[in-house]
C-alpha cells in the first residue's frame, strides 16, 4: 500500500474531522475508504468506529502519557496515537504490526520527525498498561460518554442509566426487514439458512429478523431484488404503530433515507405516500431505496415547519413524523454522535420538534393517526414533548402508547434487541 494511504493515518484523519470539525463519520469515511484496497476497508471502518466508541479512554491515556497536547498542524498525530492505543487494546492486530504501521502513519501525514515520539508513547503504554487501566477503571472517563450526557441519563433513568451506557458501548446487532410483498418472514429465513446463515425473528415486529452474525448485504438472499432491507428492529416499530392501509393518503415526514417510507409501502402497497425531507442530498437515498424495492412514492424536499410550501392544503389519513432528534438511542450504531452533540442542542431540538408537530397536526384528517417517533432516549424530546403537545392540543388523544402521565412507548438500547426509540401514537378527535 502506498505510504500516503497508510490505513492508520486515514483513520486518524477521519476521527480528527469528526471531533475537531464536527463532521459525521458517515460523511467522512466513504471517501477515505476509496483510498484503500477492498480487503482493508473493514479494518479502516473498525479503527474509525472503535476509536470514536472509546474516545474518552484514549484521550485519558494520552493525557497520562504526554506532558503537553499536540496542537496546530501536529494535531493529527494526537489521533494517530489514539489509533495505536485502540489497536493494542481492542484488536487482534499483532502488537508489533500495530506499532510499526502506526509509527509509519507519521510519514503519510508528513510528520516523519514525530515517528520517535509516537513509538515512545505507544511503548510506554505497553509497559504501564495494567497500572493505567486499573486507574482508568475508577475515572469519570470510564463511561466512554461525555459528562453532560452521563448526567442527563442519570437524571432520566436513575436505575437504568448504566445499562443504557453499557448498551451504547457495544457493537450493534444487524437487523433486517423482510419484504412481505415478496416472502413471508419464515420463508425468507429458510432461504437464509440455505445460504449458510442463521437469523432470528423479532417477537413483536412481524417483518424483523436479527442475523446471528452480521453479513455484507450482497450475501443476503434477494437483497438486490428487494426481498430484504437493512433496518433496525426499533425503526420497524414506526410502520407497525402507524398501521397504514391501502388507499390512504400518508405523509412520511423527515423521511430520508427512506427505510420507513418503503416499509409503509410494503405494509400497504396501494397507499398514496408523500415522503418529505429537508435535506436534498439525503433524498437521493429515498429514491435509491424506492428503486431497489420497485416502489413508487411522491418525494419532495421541504421543511416540516412549513407544510403549505410542499403540500398546499392537502390533508392526510396518517402521518409519520420521525422527528429530528439527538439520536441518543442509536449511539452504538453511530458512536460519533457522542462527540457531535452538545448539551445545548437538546433544548433547540425540542423546540424544533414542537414547531413541526404544531405545523403538521392541522394536516391530519379528523379520525386520522399521527405517529411521533424519535431515536432518542431523552425525555425532553419524547415524553415531555408529547405531554406538552397534548396539553396545548385539545383535539389530540393518545392511542395504544402509554398513559397521559407517561405518554408514548420508550424502547431502550440493549443487547440483541433494537436501538433506543420512542413512539407516541396520536389520534385526531
Curated annotation (Swiss-Prot):
EC nos: 2.1.1.176
Keywords assigned: Cytoplasm, Methyltransferase, RNA-binding, rRNA processing, S-adenosyl-L-methionine, Transferase
Cytoplasm keyword on record: yes
InterPro entries noted in UniProt: MeTrfase_RsmB-F_NOP2_cat (IPR049560), MeTrfase_RsmB-F_NOP2_dom (IPR001678), NusB-like_sf (IPR035926), NusB_RsmB_TIM44 (IPR006027), RCMT (IPR023267), rRNA_ssu_MeTfrase_B (IPR004573), rRNA_ssu_MeTfrase_B_ent (IPR023541), RsmB-like_ferredoxin (IPR054728)
Catalytic site: 375
Binding positions (S-adenosyl-L-methionine): 254-260, 277, 303, 322
Entry keyword Methyltransferase: yes
Subcellular location: Cytoplasm
Segments for region (Disordered): 397-419
Biased composition (Polar residues): 400-412
GO molecular function terms noted in the UniProt entry: RNA binding; rRNA (cytosine-C5-)-methyltransferase activity
GO BP, sorted A to Z: regulation of DNA-templated transcription; rRNA base methylation
Catalytic activity: cytidine(967) in 16S rRNA + S-adenosyl-L-methionine = 5-methylcytidine(967) in 16S rRNA + S-adenosyl-L-homocysteine + H(+)
GO cellular component terms given for this protein: cytosol
HAMAP family the record matches: 16SrRNA_methyltr_B
Function: Specifically methylates the cytosine at position 967 (m5C967) of 16S rRNA.
Record NCBIfam families: PRK10901.1 (NF008149), PRK14902.1 (NF011494), rsmB (TIGR00563)
Family statement: Belongs to the class I-like SAM-binding methyltransferase superfamily. RsmB/NOP family.
Protein name: Ribosomal RNA small subunit methyltransferase B
Amino acid at each position: 500500500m502506498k505510504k500516503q494511504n497508510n490505513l492508520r493515518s486515514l483513520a486518524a484523519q477521519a476521527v480528527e474531522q469528526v471531533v475537531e470539525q464536527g463532521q459525521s463519520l458517515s460523511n467522512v469515511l466513504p471517501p477515505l475508504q476509496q483510498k484503500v484496497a477492498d480487503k482493508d476497508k473493514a479494518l479502516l471502518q473498525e479503527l474509525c468506529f472503535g476509536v470514536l466508541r472509546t474516545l474518552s479512554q484514549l484521550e485519558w491515556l494520552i493525557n497520562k502519557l504526554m506532558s503537553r497536547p499536540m496542537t496546530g498542524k501536529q494535531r493529527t498525530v494526537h489521533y494517530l496515537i489514539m489509533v495505536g492505543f485502540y489497536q493494542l487494546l481492542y484488536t487482534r492486530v499483532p502488537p508489533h504490526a500495530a506499532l510499526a504501521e502506526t509509527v509509519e502513519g507519521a510519514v503519510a501525514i508528513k510528520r516523519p520527525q514525530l515517528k520517535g515520539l509516537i513509538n515512545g508513547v505507544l511503548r510506554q503504554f505497553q509497559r504501564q498498561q495494567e497500572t493505567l487501566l486499573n486507574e482508568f477503571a475508577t475515572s469519570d472517563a470510564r463511561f466512554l460518554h461525555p459528562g453532560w450526557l452521563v448526567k442527563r441519563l442519570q437524571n432520566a433513568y436513575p436505575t437504568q442509566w448504566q445499562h443504557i451506557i453499557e448498551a451504547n458501548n457495544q457493537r450493534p446487532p444487524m437487523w433486517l426487514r423482510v419484504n412481505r410483498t415478496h416472502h413471508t418472514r419464515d420463508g425468507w429465513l429458510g432461504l437464509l439458512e440455505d445460504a449458510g446463515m442463521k437469523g432470528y425473528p423479532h417477537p413483536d415486529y412481524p417483518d424483523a429478523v436479527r442475523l446471528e452474525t452480521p453479513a455484507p448485504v450482497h450475501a443476503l438472499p434477494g437483497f438486490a431484488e428487494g426481498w430484504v432491507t437493512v433496518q433496525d428492529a426499533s425503526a420497524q416499530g414506526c410502520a407497525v404503530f402507524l398501521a397504514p392501509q391501502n388507499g390512504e393518503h400518508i405523509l412520511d415526514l423527515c423521511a430520508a433515507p427512506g427505510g420507513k417510507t418503503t416499509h409503509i409501502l410494503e405494509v400497504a402497497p396501494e397507499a398514496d405516500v408523500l415522503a418529505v425531507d429537508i435535506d436534498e442530498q439525503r433524498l437521493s437515498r429515498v429514491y435509491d431505496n424506492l428503486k431497489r424495492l420497485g416502489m413508487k412514492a411522491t418525494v419532495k424536499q421541504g421543511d416540516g415547519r412549513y407544510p403549505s410550501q410542499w403540500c398546499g392544503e392537502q390533508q392526510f389519513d396518517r402521518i409519520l413524523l420521525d422527528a429530528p432528534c439527538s439520536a441518543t438511542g442509536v449511539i452504538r450504531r453511530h458512536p460519533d454522535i457522542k462527540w457531535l452533540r452538545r448539551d445545548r442542542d437538546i433544548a433547540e431540538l425540542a423546540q424544533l420538534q414542537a414547531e413541526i408537530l404544531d405545523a403538521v397536526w392541522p394536516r391530519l384528517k379528523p379520525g386520522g393517526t399521527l405517529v411521533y417517533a424519535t431515536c432518542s432516549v431523552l425525555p425532553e424530546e419524547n415524553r415531555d414533548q408529547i405531554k406538552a403537545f397534548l396539553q396545548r392540543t385539545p383535539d389530540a388523544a393518545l392511542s395504544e402508547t402509554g398513559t397521559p402521565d407517561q405518554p408514548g412507548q420508550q424502547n431502550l438500547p440493549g443487547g440483541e434487541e433494537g436501538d433506543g426509540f420512542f413512539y407516541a401514537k396520536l389520534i385526531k378527535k
